[in-house]
Amino acid sequence: MAASNLADNKCVPCRGGTPPLTHQQIEPLLAQLEGWQVEDDKKLIKSFKVKDWVAAVDFVNRITPVAEAEGHHPDLYVRWGEVRAYLWTHKIDGLTESDFYMAAMIDRVFAPTAGASRQAK
């Protein structure tokens, strides 16, 4: 399943007691995403480089309706020229497939503006 296919899935609300994905389950999902890293098998992280502060805020504003529609909200760190996205399922303090779906959706939102002045790191 390519990243674009991951983005075609719907995020599923996590129920308490759902186990987080194991390292073995994470690896094939991560391989479908470009530039995302996993921290301690608990969080997905990616830094997006953009032209300036306005572009950073614009990118966050374009992520917002997607996150709202999916009911799955990334933590976003904004600074001049960069937006850093953190994804994990808070209820289980780990990763679920929905985190990977949302990562692919964020990549899809970023793609139309990617270019020489706006690039993911």
Predicted regions located by residue number:
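Long, contiguous binding/interaction regions
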Residues: 1-34, 39-121
